[in-house]
Each structure stands twice: as C-alpha cells, then as structure tokens.
Amino acid sequence: QVTPGDSWNVACTVPGDAPNRPEDAGPDYDFGAAPIMAQGSDGRSYLLAGQKSGVAYAFDPDSGAILWQTRVGRGGWLGGIHFGIAADSGRLYAPVFDSPIEPDNPAPARPGISAIDVASGEVLWQTPAANVCNGRPLCEPGYSAAITVTPELVLAGANDGHFRILS
C-alpha cells in the first residue's frame, strides 16, 4: 500500500451505517491490476504497477522500495490507471480513464495512454483519448481495460466503445 489510510471499499457507497465501512475510508486509490516485472534499458529488473490515483510506480522487486513514481492522470475513485498496464523494450504503457464525473478531485481529467521509461520514470509520450462521445449518455473517453503491446503497436479498447491501435 503506497497511499496511507486508503481503506475504501464498496460499503463506502452505501448510505447509512453499512457493515465493513471504515471510519476514514481514504481516497480509493487501489491497484486495480496485477503488477508486472520488466527490464529497464539499464538492464535492471523493475516491478511496475499503476494506481487509480493516476500514478505509475516502479518498485525494487527485492526490497519493495519505491524507485520512482510518475503521475500520468488525475486519478480518483472513477479515474486513474484501472485494470492493466503493459511493458516492452524498456517502456511501460499506462492507460488512463479519469472520468469527468469525479466529485472528490477538481483537477482536469487526463484520459489517454502514456509511455514511460522503465528505468527513469520519464514520460516518453502521451496520447490523449479521443472524445467521440458527442453527448451520448454513459459514454466517456479514456481507457479502463488492460492494453496489449507488440514491438510496434499498442492495442487498446476504449471506454467509448472503440478499439484503437497506436504505433
């Protein structure tokens, strides 16, 4: 756990005195997907994870120490990096949702995909999510689903119902 005091669970959404509701729930910045091990351009192994806070992390796989952290999204209980990152050739790819419906965080939403250098945490490029919703109900730009990478492509299913391929 990298966010002290974050014990949010679904009971936090139930009105009244719900069982299992923590007294101080925290911001709901859990890790929605398993971490992945990747090698950086420096030859070192890194344990990588994406958090709903919108922050990507690299940990030392032996000690668990945080080596770097890079913000790529606003984050929130409906935002940040949701359900899967990917890595190849020294790069981490982080899909970000950042729903515009975020009562707890007034910062601007930053949905899209970011490529991050595994060894340094430096953002190499970012591609904002296309907003093709045109007012359709329940349609929001961004990426919640896990993405896939090949040596040349990033494959991503978007929350707006489109499948996108980035090269």
Which residues does each PLM region occupy?
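Extracytoplasmic/lumenal domain signature
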Residues: 1-31, 36-167
